[in-house]
Amino acid sequence: MSDSHLTAFDKASKAGFIIALGIVYGDIGTSPLYTMQSLVENQGGVNQVSESFILGSISLIIWTLTLITTIKYVLIALKADNHHEGGIFSLFTLVRKISPWLIIPAMIGGATLLSDGALTPAVTVTSAIEGLKAVPGLSHIYQNQTNVIITTLVILIVLFGIQRFGTGFIGKIFGPVMFIWFSFLGVSGFFNTLGHLEIFKAINPYYALHLLFSPENHRGIFILGSIFLATTGAEALYSDLGHVGRGNIYVSWPFVKMCIVLSYCGQAAWILANKHSGIELNPFFASVPSQLRVYLVSLATLAAIIASQALISGSFTLISEAMRLKIFPLFRVTYPGANLGQLYIPVINWILFAVTSCTVLAFRTSAHMEAAYGLAITITMLMTTILLKYYLIKKGTRPILAHLAMAFFALVEFIFFLASAIKFMHGGYAVVILALAIVFVMFIWHAGTRIVFKYVKSLNLNDYKEQIKQLRDDVCFDLYQTNVVYLSNRMQDHMIDRSILYSILDKRPKRAQVYWFVNVQVTDEPYTAKYKVDMMGTDYMVRVNLYLGFRMPQTVPRYLRTIVQDLMESGRLPKQEQEYTITPGRDVGDFRFVLIEERVTNARQLSNFERFIMQTKASIKHVTASPMRWFGLQYSEVTLEVVPLILSDVLKLPIKELVPVEDSEA
């Protein structure tokens, strides 16, 4: 890692400041749309709140943002970057060598982040469109919630529909729009507080603690379920670290926090001034002069779309990382933008669209969605805390300090989890079921991979070098291909899957000029692209280890083309002159990739549980991307061969021959 790269990552700039506003803070920046509304409605309405309730609520919000977002994520988690990348899977790659069980919190955290995030577009866009109820001239239309739902669904259809084309063309406006959004939050909130400056007493944590145990708080500790809505975007802040750099987050977060806090204070001041008016509108929109509300709704809708876009892009990145870490099935990934960071996964896109649309149709109002929102993200934060503890110890923090610090955050987040648990019966069960389904898929995929590693037999390539040379020179066999390439998941030193040698020598002897054995290894660094070659003392057998970062596409032919050129230029691989070609001077022959698919047999070594794992994994494979697409082989010559999973199972089954009995009269 060069000093210049490190400096750029930690350095802030004006452009980086604006970009960070558009990428990092969409979720947490749109929380003022619905957080105060949730608090007031759960208390029984505007006319049921008191000054002490409002002060306590604002104090709880301020200190939640301070403890969780500022201290845990901005000051601690942002230092846990994996070569400038953040997020729970990046954090896991930093600590996974410490203990194999750490894969569990990583899978749970990733699954809950994905499941709860599916609600973000629904709740933010619906909340923004519901603001039209407060707009003179449009209120009579949008008092009918069906019209709100239709408008929301149209926006979601467009939003998810444009993902396949890339969002770079609209991404350029995200930063400026969010700058206007946060500026409006801050300015409007400040002017609303001018008549009730006592609201700033909420900075004192006494009011927060007092409200939790006050009889004026009708919900008791469960009020924290609504308070938590203010900080649900903190995990996304960490996940987007690699997109904007640590320095830009350090500089932009104080501005964002100030604007958000002023917005909450402004809404609180409006509530205090209008608690006897009987107005039951969302405080966020009601606190703005009526003539400005249509512009505010437009701005809020744009902010909601930007927040949703950040969530969708984050989900693609999260799934992509999980696939490369071999804890999630392979799905087709495309790159519609000009950079690797802008990716698109069609299956995930439309699953997210289906879940989001069903959420809108099932819950109908943002108030009902808020009742289910936030439960799963508390689990994500707890899992991040577990991984952070091991990271701090690994980096040299005294164990007692790491344990105490993370125990404090775990306690705070566990209290939020308990407070949010009531949401399970109000729709949170849907999010939990989705999270459990994702965890189940991750577990099956990970466990299936471990079972294969446990049972598949490996052989030493050196023991078969002579046979392969004889086959190469045996003109009795037709030339199968100039270059035959085998992709192996397991290749250590000269040991290789028995199924590959079985394919070359036994199934149908494959005569070629050069045999390639390629193994792709995913590294902890996000953007690594390196390789290591072993010619095994020959010019016809090549072992290639590709080391690719967990965010790099695994398009093997592109890398192999470069490797072949390097080997020929260095004289390690003979040139393959072509007699017939449309490319003058072409000295590289044709290639065929052989993919071996291992299928479960009734092998005796497998326990019933292991057989269930492998059969379930095989079922999941039917809806996933083929290895041919995953490795970028769709434009290459490919042969798919099926072999039984357990080639080492040679136990003889008992069977007797029936011998005819001679006729007694003969």
Curated annotation (Swiss-Prot):
Q: What is its main location?
A: membrane
Q: Which domain of life is it from?
A: Bacteria
Example of a GO MF term = symporter activity
Alphabetic keyword roster: Cell membrane, Ion transport, Membrane, Potassium, Potassium transport, Symport, Transmembrane, Transmembrane helix, Transport
Record InterPro entries: K+_transporter (IPR003855), K_trans_C (IPR053952), K_trans_N (IPR053951), Kup (IPR023051)
Cellular location(s): Cell membrane
Catalysed reactions, as listed in the record: K(+)(in) + H(+)(in) = K(+)(out) + H(+)(out)
Q: From which residue to which does any coiled coil extend?
A: none
- Name the GO cellular-component terms: plasma membrane
UniProt KW Transcription regulation keyword: no
- Report the membrane topology from the UniProt record: Multi-pass membrane protein
Instruction: Please give the start and end residues of each transmembrane region.
Output: 16-36, 58-78, 98-118, 141-161, 165-185, 221-241, 253-273, 299-319, 343-363, 373-393, 399-419, 424-444
Give a short account of what the protein does.
Answer: Transport of potassium into the cell. Likely operates as a K(+):H(+) symporter.
Which family, according to UniProt? Belongs to the HAK/KUP transporter (TC 2.A.72) family.
Protein name in UniProt:
Probable potassium transport system protein Kup
Q: Which organism is it from?
A: Streptococcus pyogenes serotype M28 (strain MGAS6180)
